[in-house]
Amino acid sequence: MGARASILSGGKLDEWEKIQLRPGGKKRYKMKHLIWASRELERFALDPGLLETSEGCQKIIRQLQPSLQTGSEELKSLFNTVAVLYYVHQRAGVTDTKEALDKLEEEQNKSQQKTQQAAADKGVSQNYPIVQNLQGQMVHQSLSPRTLNAWVKVIEEKAFSPEVIPMFSALSEGATPTDLNTMLNTVGGHQAAMQMLKDTINEEAAEWDRLHPVHAGPAPPGQMREPRGSDIAGTTSTLQEQIQWMTGNPPVPVGDIYKRWIILGLNKIVRMYSPVSILDIKQGPKEPFRDYVDRFFKVLRAEQASQDVKGWMTDTLLVQNANPDCKTILKALGTGATLEEMMTACQGVGGPSHKARVLAEAMSQANSAIMMQKSNFKGQRRVVKCFNCGKEGHIARNCRAPRKKGCWKCGREGHQMKDCTERQANFFRENLAFQQGEARKFPSEQTRANSPTSRELRVQRGDNPLSEAGAERRGTVPSLSFPQITLWQRPLVTIKIGGQIKEALLDTGADDTVLEDINLPGKWKPKMIGGIGGFIKVKQYDNILIEICGHKAIGTVLVGPTPVNIIGRNMLTQIGCTLNFPVSPIETVPVKLKPGMDGPKVKQWPLTEEKIKALTEICLEMEKEGKISKIGPENPYNTPVFAIKKKDSSKWRKLVDFKELNKRTQDFWEVQLGIPHPAGLKKKKSVTVLDVGDAYFSVPLDKDFKKYTAFTIPSVNNETPGIRYQYNVLPQGWKGSPAIFQCSMTKILEPFRMKNPDIVIYQYMDDLYVGSDLEIGQHRTKIEELREHLLRWGFTTPDKKHQKEPPFLWMGHELHPDKWTVQPIQLPNKDSWTVNDIQKLVGKLNWASQIYPGIKVRPLCKLLRGAKALTDIVPLTAEAELELAKNREILREPVHGVYYDPSKDLIAEIQKQGDGQWTYQIYQNPFKNLKTGKYAKVRSAHTNDVKQLTEAVQKIALESIVIWGKRSPKFKLPILKETWDTWWTDYWQATWIPEWEFVNTPPLVKLWYQLETEPIAGADTFYVDGASNRETKKGKAGYVTDKGKQKVVSLTETTNQKAELQAIYLALQDSGSEVNIVTDSQYALGIIQAQPDKSESEIVNQIIEQLIQKERVYLSWVPAHKGIGGNEQVDKLVSAGVRKILFLDGIDKAQEEHEKYHNNWRAMASDFNLPPIVAKEIVASCDKCQLKGEAMHGQVDCSPGIWQLDCTHLEGKVILVAVHVASEYIEAEVIPAETGQETAYFILKLAGRWPVKIIHTDNGSNFTSAAVKASCWWAGIQQEFGIPYNPQSQGVVESINKELKKIIGQVRDQAEHLKTAVQMAVFIHNFKRKGGIGGYSAGERIIDIISTDIQTRELQKQITKIQNFRVYYRDSRNPVWKGPAKLLWKGEGAVVIQDNSEIKIVPRRKAKIIRDYGKQMAVDDCVAGRQDED
């Protein structure tokens, strides 16, 4: 104590004792205050010796000041004492504590201003300064509401236009990742954009982690860890860590890095919202240059390019894409002109006044030489000739005509003029121009079908140029009687004018007809017209005759130096020429991916060199035909491609594995439910079978879906990058191709069908059956019409597959004029059969059974039972070999079917083959079958012949409706009418009874026994029951009679169901010829009441034998465990020592069913005899039953104590919302401001009403404030923060926000103030909206959840003995044994355990229960543990 008295000495101590504790107070500082201060400093781990100097006091002040806001009163007193002592050392002459504190604050403010001024002098932005306070610490200043408001306004007003990026860059200058996340959180409502941004951030973070791997071993002491990608994104790093990284030595600018990632994502978003390319920005003819510049730079900002590239775009594209008037002026300025000089020079260009000035200037320059006639008008003839347009007077470099594709010498594409081998320039080839008025050759129909639109010029004959266009729009086929010129190349035609042949361009955009280098008769007058690149002077000739494509027109012709001869509208209208934009012949079907899914991104696997070579050749050919097209790296999708050899050929076939794309593509409705059958065909005089070539490749694919079909042809040893393609047509192997093709083909055939109603066309995929009653010549004419019709739509019908003469091969059948059969079937002879061989064999026999009666396959199918590999060898049983030999014999002689006659009735005859197999024939005339078939399906393990016969009848009736459209044929059945009627009346549930007659075809079907419908008077009554233990498989079966007789037998390796059946068998054995049997087993009752005569179960077959021997049997059912006399007695009799009555017996089944159906707790408690507490716990632990929808990454924690908090905005005010995650119960209120103080007060109110364990919030400044942290600490609440833009984080409260606003909108007119409407909406949501689990309201649900939680905890406390056990367990995703966990309940099916604080239900088969041996477990060899294992 004495040592500390030396802090002040002499005059300083006297000055110390003069200072007042409070202004105007009587108490003054004493020596005891110094001694107390030194002791307090030791408590705070500070050196008391620091009090002896002013520098030491300053260090103490720096250390204590950050803790003042949350510190205790003792801490504040200590700070005040040290501050006064600091000024005593300084001899500042303070009079009281307040004066010392005011001086200290003033001094600190001056220091901070100096720091800020120094930073400003250095040119560093101070938007979000990380400044050094008086204590030398780096302190972060949070974003201001004004900055956030400016950012929100930018997004709302600009809607992700290019201006957003520079604005974001300016507002976020110097920001930390936490600041950036705060900015993004404020615009989180733009979910699509934020999802794109999140994807970009994740990709960049992963790339950062890849380029900056974690160093092995622990970090050196005192050194900060290196930031990971998630640290930079602010999700796994704290604000303090970010500040240390940004201000460290050397610094890691995590804020700038994260900002760069966000700007990359914003670029992608801007490109999506503003999809205009800089190349598309061109100045309009009359658009002011200033407006053009504004548009240009707006799009330039959105371009993802470096500054150098953007500079090049400004220098070149700005001038290049200007209109001709401005371009002339800009080129005159030179390359060094600034933007201001350009805008000044082009001011006013493009308006009417500018046009007038130019025209006047041009006219003033017209001299007498221009007005001279004929040859004087032309200048001196030049010898140079243009390779581009073929005209003399200029070279190709200066040509103003559009650039021609291909070689300038020969006109062919694929090489340049310097590489051309032709000697003579022949660009205007003869096949490109009309000759003698005929249309030039245009692209094939298939190419047009593959194009999105087919634009063409038509020269019409007739007075109504619109009639044909209208007819085409109605769906009829356009007539080809007049020339058509498609616009895939320039519409150049040959014209005749003044006896001279010229080539000219048909230009629907030109008013006048302008020709070059031609002498015309008659007088002319001078004229100036605006042309390409400026004004040209021309001679105007009137009433000139021109012949175009065989059509004559008279009108004005202008002659002058035009780059290309033009036929304008003044001539085109006279000959009826129209510009048509017909829709593509085949309308594309729009296709989308399944909601929430993206396209496939499957890597291409390696391929051999020969496969790569084959695929390259195939794709080159397909690309030429327009079926696929090359794509660049901008397409992120890929599907693997491979090649296989064609059957019996050395050629290769390309296959694309669309498995992943098929999973992601929307579902399609199958437009054709099955394949047509020849038995349903009507007999026709003439028949033709056609095949559509390249069927799928003739139908265009939706342009927006093409990108998802991308695939890559790799190179050997990665010599070059892979060649990327995407499909333009329907791909083979894609799930949508069949449905879209069938739909398209139906639409195409519809006009032909309507025009030719007497012709029958059966269409299945690319196979067409065409039948008619026309003579063969007329029929073939119609076939050619059909082929021509299909060709116009782009579908070819190759001659190779055009079948004109019988027999016709169609759909696997062979068609003759008056009969049909299946194509020849050869059954293989093998010494050994694999599973795959037998599968193919059964398939062939099933196919043959449609016309070959008597074929049986059941013995062969029995060989395939069990899980076997395709290559496993299967020995044939004697039964199977016999059936195979019989089937060979049946197939030896060919059998034919006949065609359907609509005027006659159908007859179906069924025969029993034995062993559960049936065969049938459908015919109209005896011995002339339309088709045959077989039935051998066993729908249940216990059946009888009558039941199988009725199932066969049902199958044939359905088949009749499908093939012939008839409800039912007349049946001939091998069963007595009395037997049939008995079964039909009692057991067959149907709305119709087929017409049938008895056929005495052995073996006949009969019922072997019949159960009574009423109890038998005078007969003994047997109460039967059975029980078994699931673990030991031991059980008992027995009965008790109404006369006191009883019997029990012990069973091994049994189940409850088998024991119940065994009890019935005992009763039948020990009873007389008449007996009443009562059981409580619905399973046993259902089997026996169906009156089976055969079964796969041995015990059921034994029961059937006993039933056949009885005269009369009555079987009844009573509910179990309801106190019914005889049933209760026999239940006790068989349960003794067998059943363990534990309520958790059914918990595993309940869990499995809940995982499938998500039923509520009441249903599980009822169905599985579970206590409500356990059933509710199963529901409570299922996150799918607590949330609407499912989180994209993981599941939301639905424990009873978790709440999510968020602020939402409405009518300019802030609504703070808290939602109980498990029940969706909400608390909400309008708060004055979005501050930490208001939020902390709300949290304390919430904690005072409900048990709050965890609150989950976003990273908003109010939630991260010290006030909220303090209130959470005081109330014992754990606070968790969400990951920005992760739907898992705040999904529940976000959806509740939307729901709350919706309800507020419904009641807003009933309340004057918003805060009233909010409370009304909360009441409605919590207590007036029911649904979800148990049909509860949210208020009822939260009370129920909390009550259940309390009951469960109290119930656990009562279990004492069982807690002496420990459980080791495994969960489904991890094979490692976990534990030990505490055992709470044990049942036969599952156990309830507690692992740490989490209660889990684990299936019994995944748990090991052992005694708690304490420390001995660690050293013993666990022998005793294995002995005690349950």
Swiss-Prot record:
A motif (Nuclear localization signal) lies at residues 26-32. It comes from the Viruses. It comes from Human immunodeficiency virus type 1 group M subtype F1 (isolate VI850) (HIV-1). The keyword DNA repair does not apply. GO terms for cellular component: host cell; host cell nucleus; host cell plasma membrane; host multivesicular body; membrane; viral nucleocapsid; virion membrane. Zn(2+) binds at H1154, H1158, C1182, C1185. Residues 8-43 are annotated as: Interaction with host CALM1. One of its GO terms (biological process) is viral penetration into host nucleus. Residues 1196-1346 form the Integrase catalytic domain. Residues 273-359 are annotated as: Dimerization/Multimerization of capsid protein p24. Residues 1365-1412 bind DNA. This is Gag-Pol polyprotein. Mg(2+) 3 binds at D1206, D1258, E1294. The record marks G217, P218 as: Cis/trans isomerization of proline peptide bond. The keyword Transcription does not apply.
